[in-house]
Amino acid sequence: ANKEKLFGLAHNQPKVKEAPVTLILVGNKNGWDNNNPVWDEMLKSVGGNQQMVDGAKQAAAFLYGSSDERKLKFAESNTGLLAMSIMMAAMEYGVDSHPMSGLDFEGIHKAFELSENETVVMAIALGYYDKNQNLYPRRPRRQFDDIASII
């Protein structure tokens, strides 16, 4: 039922149904706040130095929680890094992945009853490439030097 629901919200992209697993990656806009268990882990790792942890919490509150834009950027960037890690791990195990951003983000948010602090970032289809299927040829990619400057 969830796969069918996602299929429609992914604009009927066949890979949603064809892949054995499709993940919806959701970012937590409040993942930086005091409720994150990472602060307890940090306290242990710094030998119980509460002052150091409090300083890190204050920095996080400013850097990631001082505006709606910063909260959204925090959630999206961390979830994007997680997505890349998932795809790299999948590749290591011989599993193919296909990230998808052509989604009805608001529809997914409602259909899967996400909270106000959660934001849909992307979906990833995971499975095995069907060698009998013809794919579109890969389009040319721009070179690093064409899109980036080292400063």
Descriptions of predicted regions:
Residues 1-151:
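Acidic, surface-exposed loops and disordered segments
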